[in-house]
Amino acid sequence: MSTANPASAPDSFFSASLEQADPEIAAAIRGELGRQRHEVELIASENIVSRAVLEAQGSVMTNKYAEGYPGNRYYGGCEFVDVAENLAIDRAKKLFGANFANVQPNSGSQMNQAVFLALLQPGDTFMGLDLAAGGHLTHGAPVNMSGKWFKPVHYTVRREDQMIDMDAVAKLAEEAKPKLIIAGGSAYPRAWDFKRFREIADSVGAYFMVDMAHFAGLVAGGVHASPVPHAHVTTTTTHKSLRGPRGGLILTNDEALAKKFNSAIFPGLQGGPLMHVIAAKAVAFKEALQPDFKVYTKNVVENAKALAETLRSAGFDLVSGGTDNHLMLVDLRPKGLKGNVSEKALVRAGITCNKNGIPFDPEKPFVTSGLRLGTPAATTRGFGVAEFQQVGHLIAEVLNAIAQSSDGAAPLVEASVKQRVKELTDRFPIYQ
């Protein structure tokens, strides 16, 4: 007969720390925390969430299945997850001035897929910004579902100033007669004319959708025009400049469309929603409703302009000449550099960014002629204009050094910059 204590396994299961249960994963998390603490994060789609968001996302709500919507679930025991989801919905509506909100999309891709499922049939024509001009994979890239199942027609930017030509968009819409027109992207540094887009959509009988995943935080903070009054549907991720957990959000002012989007998410695309993530979304929306979030977003834009001007003054070309939001694209061709080589050198120097294609880029997507830089994450940790000017000079120092090297590396300069980056980040600690 066994003499083992039958309670020992459950006791360990509910009490063992991550370090005790899985030291390998614990070590990886420690390493990632160290990286975030000691590197300047300039990836435009990344941010640093609050401890409260982390706590909500790591809560016991991860245990709960809740297929359906608040008050109409397929499972019992949903009274507390209903509270969380209703708070997330109400806060999202208040934050963006929308009549309806679906907080269940697990990702940005799934929120956009839900709009397509609700509004289009396979083979239907839609318009979006070309990925090469700053659009997004889910707006009709050939490798994406949106490009495989539907018929994308892409508008682009002018060669002379790399900005969207609205007259050209109108002409293309008249020719293509799309059922849906999308504004928004992943690497467009300028403002969008939502009013004109809606007029164009109305002129051809199309729905107008805005994917504001990148600039939603700026909209919430009042430093970027809101698409919600103009669009039939607005989608956004809840991370990036909104500074929440990774996930998606669908907004509309049209009740009939809201029902379509709800059905498209569940049961159309997803089953049980991630209630721990929805709880964290609610926390992030509450944070974004506070006055200090307006200050934060104002700083994000000011810091982006400071970084852009510093790089321009150091002799670097910027796509479209600058930025109106939180991101910028550096055209590396005048320096004789490639995006992939430049990204690696900056990472070695403690500055995290990503290679990025530029409009009419002659290089392949995994090489590129550009870098994308963004200010949300470093602004969250407290960087201001002076710090971003310093970062701009450090970037220029590294890139100028590797431009003079034969192998895309400048070890002495990279090491020197990395030390100065550590001194800078030590002044702005995170998660103490």
UniProtKB/Swiss-Prot annotation:
Mind telling me which residue stretches traverse the membrane in this protein?
none
**CDD domains named among the record's database cross-references:** SHMT
Cofactor list: pyridoxal 5'-phosphate
Q: Give the family per the record.
A: Belongs to the SHMT family.
N6-(pyridoxal phosphate)lysine occurs at K240
The UniProt entry's GO CC annotations, sorted and at most eight, read: cytosol
Which PROSITE patterns does this chain map to? SHMT
Q: Which compartments is it annotated to reside in?
A: Cytoplasm
- What assembly does the database describe for this protein? Homodimer.
**SUPFAM superfamilies given in the database record:** PLP-dependent transferases
Pfam families cross-referenced by the UniProt entry: SHMT
The pathway where this protein functions is: One-carbon metabolism; tetrahydrofolate interconversion; Amino-acid biosynthesis; glycine biosynthesis; glycine from L-serine: step 1/1
Instruction: Report whether Lyase shows up as a keyword of the record.
Output: no
So what does this thing catalyse? (6R)-5,10-methylene-5,6,7,8-tetrahydrofolate + glycine + H2O = (6S)-5,6,7,8-tetrahydrofolate + L-serine
Q: What is this protein called?
A: Serine hydroxymethyltransferase 1
The protein's Enzyme Commission number? 2.1.2.1
Q: Which UniProt keywords apply?
A: Amino-acid biosynthesis, Cytoplasm, One-carbon metabolism, Pyridoxal phosphate, Transferase
Q: List the residues marked with site Plays an important role in substrate specificity.
A: H239
List the molecular function annotations (GO) for this entry.
glycine hydroxymethyltransferase activity; pyridoxal phosphate binding
Q: Which GO terms describe its biological process?
A: glycine biosynthetic process from serine; tetrahydrofolate interconversion
Which residues are noted in the entry as (6S)-5,6,7,8-tetrahydrofolate-binding? L131, G135, H136, L137
What role does this protein play? Catalyzes the reversible interconversion of serine and glycine with tetrahydrofolate (THF) serving as the one-carbon carrier. This reaction serves as the major source of one-carbon groups required for the biosynthesis of purines, thymidylate, methionine, and other important biomolecules. Also exhibits THF-independent aldolase activity toward beta-hydroxyamino acids, producing glycine and aldehydes, via a retro-aldol mechanism.
